From Swiss-Prot:
GO terms for molecular function: phosphoadenylyl-sulfate reductase (thioredoxin) activity. This is Phosphoadenosine 5'-phosphosulfate reductase. Pathway: Sulfur metabolism; hydrogen sulfide biosynthesis; sulfite from sulfate: step 3/3. The gene is cysH. It is found in: Cytoplasm. The keyword Cytoplasm applies. The active site is at residue 239. It comes from the Bacteria.
Amino acid sequence: MSKFYIENINLLNSEKKNNILSELNLLLSNYSAEERISWALSHLPHTQIMSSSFGIQSTVLLHLIIKKKPDIPVILIDTGYLFPETYNFIDFLTNKFHLNLKVFRSTISSAWQEARYGKLWEKGIEGIDFYNNINKVQPMNFALNELSVQTWFAGLRHDQSKSRNLLPYLSIKKGIFKILPILDWSKDKIKDYLKENNLDTHPLYNNGYSSVGDTHTTKKHMPGMLEEETRFFGLKRECGLHEN
């Protein structure tokens, strides 16, 4: 299927669009992560970015993509509440890989938010959803518009949570192609790739964290816990960036 034809999927009706996406997802399911990235870089619209939380295993997708497209814009949504170790990790990886880092934030500072709304993360699921909307969803939507993004690479995986185990490799959200190259990778495959390529993990990994977000809504992984229970007090897994 040609690049020209794929770019025009958005002009088709829902049924035809879904049929083509099903065919492409079947194709991508037989590819390796590297082949998926190469295919996407060649066939999907060329205003391309990747997003990264610079979390525990984020180095994997960064490494896979920048080998093929070193100057790809890397979008970071900074809530102002990341761990100090995360900010240091961002600086370290940006310098090491010469990342084309693009940082976006809420138009309301974290201090002003607390003055206006209080500690939203302590106000149940509604407070968390509102917090995520103004600190993550709105800045990401601004970033996608500001950079005129047509194709979005992200590092989601099926085994990360129940909410992610049915995700497709390729989807279209608000007219933007979203590709998940390591969707079928297991934790063991992630660990093997990190070791084989001598890549760095987040500093908090060795302190018992399996997932890292904001300081106030991230817990260490304890025996018997699911990974998704380490975030948002177990009330939810997604921060809103990857929800429909």
